[in-house]
């Protein structure tokens, strides 16, 4: 796991004057704590206790070499009678269940004995496992107190979970426990800033504490120090002073000031006195299993004894993060450095107490800590993949309001601002600005007249001189603007509606009203005619159910309703000889009207139905244009086919002339007939034309009594229809709905064989129909 085989090979960054420098810094008066908590926050004289502690540190090497009871007696003399009993009882506090753990005892027995090196301070005491066997007996033999002095003096705290996800800076600052005027609390009182009394945590960190408050120097030189060692290897952390692996929660330049009792207990652990714990046993205490203190070199532990302890409950008034609870160590086979396998150090997180700060100051401090943490993550390769790592400077330089507007929007705003500066009448557009600069110019002119100093030239705003076009104001008109898209421009950035106003004359409005009224009348006629049609269709049922004497009246009623339907379709006015086709065309332009005509034709007489067919043939191109979307005209083909078998040859010839838009007399037609072209390009028109040609050919070939004049008319009409079919391109020719069977013999009488084959190809005649 590490580059070195043992902790002894790890290089130590230890200064010889560490204790001396620590003592010199402790001698300085902490003005910050005095201003915050008052001068009466400490019950005893801490300077005198610190001087005794400094003398104890000087006598530490001598006391470590003797291994007798003299060192303990000298230490007790320095600390005094009151602290002697307390320190001795605190140092004997060992959890019995943890010492009886077979995993812990096996790790103690299998640990190899390290060879002491010259120059080390009693390395056998720290590394030898035999010492643990000698002191284990006295430790277990002595009676463990049920409630220790520390548990009695300090507040009880419940077990706390990990507080990484909780913002500790939001906790309220507790009340001050002392007052500079009233005085100090008794020794057994709660330290300053300690939370209310709660359940105690059974950890070694709480057992080694002193009930006296701990003075901590504020981190003044580095205002917001960044946490060390988030992504560094343990070997690198060993070489970094005050790193998080060493358990030092303070900033690098601020060492903690421990109480005399804590310092005496830690330094006194180096002597092999009965009831005291060696660093080897100290590292195996359950509170330190898995902590950075257990994975250190004994020399490093001995040299950094005043800095390696994690913050105890006394420190939690300022560092409010409790020590993390770690599971008991697992069993590993013996090998080189078993303590490195059993104990995996984890760097504690530094969380300062900021309850004494202003809420806005706390929020700023929290943001800077997050930025510093992200910086270390990016530097150690924990950022985004693919090289998309942003430096801390770029992160701080990032504008939160960047990229909120497109370049087009920025140019838009700039143009609007520049347009506001373009003015032909500045006093009207910007009165206050002009008056302000006039006052400035007057004051500057007065100063120039009085003083002889250099003239001051004031910067003036230079506006672009662009001619402004005056636009006549037109209020927005909402009439006819429904469904229009909104249009935005520089002049009208929030234009609500782009209204299109069209002025119409009275004649146009009159015509539009007439068309609208005409369509409404047509719809009313269609509904009335449909009611008559339903009554006529229900006549047979009523006729069978009626009595014999009621049937003549029903027959007359049926005839009357059929005439009414025909009159509604044709729109014949009283006294008018021939009805107009306009009314019928209006009905045929509506889909419901076309379906209604197809249902009415079987009930009409032959003359009435022939008149409907004639009107349809005359206006077929217009009806085809109106039927392009509905395509309902093919429903009329079946009733028209049945009607053609009841019409004479003269009527069929006249109907064909109406369909082809030919005059009644035998005259030469125009070379191009748009009417016939529109009929041939529609499937209903082409199918109706082929049916008329087939029915007319049958009538003229089977009736020898037909006059020669009628035969000549028929021959001329057939010749014109054949020429038009040959002229129109095949792609423009529509596909007919049905093709008569006698059509090939019909065309063979009027064209040659080559043209007949071309007609067959165009009309897609199937083989065998010849």
From Swiss-Prot:
It comes from the Eukaryota. Residues 449-770 are annotated as: Region C. The modification Phosphoserine is found at residues 177, 179, 184, 278. Residues 369-380 have a biased composition (Low complexity). Keywords: Cytoplasm, Methylation, Nucleus, Phosphoprotein, RNA-binding. Residues 7-33 have a biased composition (Acidic residues). The modification Phosphothreonine is found at residues 178, 194. InterPro entries: Pat1-like, PAT1_dom. A motif (Nuclear export signal) lies at residues 86-95. Residues 223-397 are annotated as: Involved in RNA-binding. GO terms for molecular function: poly(G) binding; poly(U) RNA binding; RNA binding. Residues 1-397 are annotated as: Involved in nuclear foci localization. Residues 85-388 are annotated as: Region N. Residues 385-394 have a biased composition (Basic and acidic residues). Residues 321-337 have a biased composition (Pro residues). It is found in: Cytoplasm, P-body; Nucleus; Nucleus, PML body; Nucleus speckle. GO terms for biological process: deadenylation-dependent decapping of nuclear-transcribed mRNA; P-body assembly. One of its GO terms (cellular component) is cytosol. Residues 398-770 are annotated as: Involved in nuclear speckle localization. The region C, also named Pat-C, is required for RNA-binding and mediates the binding with the Lsm-containing SMN-Sm protein complex and the decapping machinery. It folds into an alpha-alpha superhelix, exposing conserved and basic residues on one side of the domain. RNA-binding protein involved in deadenylation-dependent decapping of mRNAs, leading to the degradation of mRNAs. Acts as a scaffold protein that connects deadenylation and decapping machinery. Required for cytoplasmic mRNA processing body (P-body) assembly. Interacts (via region A) with DDX6/RCK. Interacts (via region H and region C) with LSM1 and LSM4. Interacts (via region N) with DCP1A, DCP2, EDC3, EDC4 and XRN1. Interacts with the CCR4-NOT complex. Interacts with the Lsm-containing SMN-Sm protein complex. Interacts with EIF4ENIF1/4E-T. Belongs to the PAT1 family. This is Protein PAT1 homolog 1. It comes from Rattus norvegicus (Rat).
């Amino acid at each position: 796991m590490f580059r070195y085989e043992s902790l002894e090979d790890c290089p130590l960054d230890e200064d010889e004057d560490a204790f001396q420098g620590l003592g010199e810094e402790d001698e300085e008066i902490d003005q910050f704590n005095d201003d915050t908590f008052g001068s009466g926050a400490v019950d005893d004289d801490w300077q005198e206790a610190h001087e005794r502690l400094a003398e104890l540190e000087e006598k530490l090497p001598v006391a470590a070499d003797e291994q007798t009871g003299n060192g303990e007696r000298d230490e007790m003399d320095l600390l005094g009678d009151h602290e002697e009993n307390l320190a001795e009882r605190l140092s004997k506090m060992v959890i019995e269940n943890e010492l009886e753990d077979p995993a812990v005892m096996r790790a103690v027995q299998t640990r190899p004995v390290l060879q002491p090196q010259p120059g080390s301070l009693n390395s056998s005491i720290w590394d030898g496992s035999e010492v643990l066997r000698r002191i284990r007996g006295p430790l277990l033999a002595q009676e463990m107190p049920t409630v220790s002095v520390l548990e009695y003096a300090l507040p009880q705290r419940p077990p706390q979970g990990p507080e990484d996800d909780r913002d500790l800076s939001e906790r309220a600052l507790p009340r001050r426990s002392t007052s500079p005027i009233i005085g100090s609390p008794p020794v057994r009182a709660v330290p300053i800033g300690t939370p209310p009394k709660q359940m105690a945590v059974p950890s070694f960190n709480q057992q080694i504490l002193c009930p006296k408050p701990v003075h901590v120097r504020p981190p003044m030189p580095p205002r917001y120090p960044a946490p060390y060692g988030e992504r560094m290897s343990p070997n690198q952390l060993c070489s970094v002073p005050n790193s998080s692996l060493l358990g030092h929660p303070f900033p690098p330049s601020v060492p903690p000031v421990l109480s005399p009792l804590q310092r005496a207990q830690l330094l006194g652990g180096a002597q092999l006195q009965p009831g005291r714990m060696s660093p080897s046993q100290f590292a195996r205490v359950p509170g330190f299993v898995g902590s950075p203190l257990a994975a250190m070199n004994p020399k490093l532990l001995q040299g950094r004894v005043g800095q390696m302890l994690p913050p105890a409950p006394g420190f939690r008034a300022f560092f409010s993060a409790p020590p993390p609870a770690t599971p008991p160590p697992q069993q590993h086979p013996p090998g080189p450095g078993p303590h490195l396998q059993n104990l995996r150090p984890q760097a504690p997180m530094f969380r300062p107490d900021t309850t004494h700060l202003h809420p806005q100051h706390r929020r700023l401090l929290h943001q800077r800590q997050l930025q510093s943490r992200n910086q270390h993550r990016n530097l150690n390769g924990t950022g985004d993949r693919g090289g998309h790592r942003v430096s801390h400077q770029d992160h701080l330089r990032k504008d939160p309001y960047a990229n909120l507007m497109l370049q087009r929007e920025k140019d838009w705003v700039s143009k609007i601002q520049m347009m506001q500066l373009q003015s032909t009448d500045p006093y009207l557009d910007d009165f206050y600005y002009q008056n302000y600069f006039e006052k400035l110019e007057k004051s500057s002119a007065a100063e120039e007249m009085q003083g002889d100093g250099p003239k001051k030239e004031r910067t003036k705003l230079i506006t672009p001189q662009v001619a402004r076009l005056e636009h006549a104001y037109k209020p927005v008109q909402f009439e006819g603007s429904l469904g229009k898209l909104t249009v935005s421009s520089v002049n009208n950035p929030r234009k609500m509606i782009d209204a299109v106003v069209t002025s119409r004359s009275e004649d146009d409005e009159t015509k539009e009203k007439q068309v609208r009224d005409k369509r409404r009348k047509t719809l009313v006629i269609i509904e009335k005619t449909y009611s008559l049609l339903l009554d006529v269709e229900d006549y047979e049922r009523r006729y069978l159910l009626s009595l014999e004497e009621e049937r003549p009246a029903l027959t007359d009623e049926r005839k009357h309703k059929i005439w009414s339907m025909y009159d509604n379709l044709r729109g014949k006015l009283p006294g008018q000889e021939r009805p107009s086709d306009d009314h019928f065309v209006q009905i045929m332009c509506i889909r419901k009207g076309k379906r209604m005509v197809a249902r009415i034709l079987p009930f009409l007489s032959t003359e009435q139905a022939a008149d409907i067919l004639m009107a349809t043939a005359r206006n077929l191109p217009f009806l085809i244009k109106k039927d392009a979307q509905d395509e309902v005209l093919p429903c009329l083909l079946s009733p028209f086919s049945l009607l053609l078998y009841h019409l004479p040859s003269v009527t069929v010839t006249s109907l064909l002339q109406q369909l082809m838009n030919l005059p009644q007399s035998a005259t030469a037609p125009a070379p191009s007939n748009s009417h016939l072209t529109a009929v041939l390009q529609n499937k209903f028109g082409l199918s109706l034309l082929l049916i008329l040609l087939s029915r007319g050919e049958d009538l003229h070939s089977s009736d020898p009594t037909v006059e020669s004049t009628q035969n000549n008319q028929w021959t001329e009409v057939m010749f014109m229809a054949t020429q038009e079919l040959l002229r129109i391109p095949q792609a423009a020719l529509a596909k007919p709905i049905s093709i008569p069977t006698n059509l090939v013999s019909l065309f063979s009488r009027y064209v040659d064989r080559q043209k007949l084959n071309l007609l067959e190809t165009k009309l897609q005649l199937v083989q065998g129909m010849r």
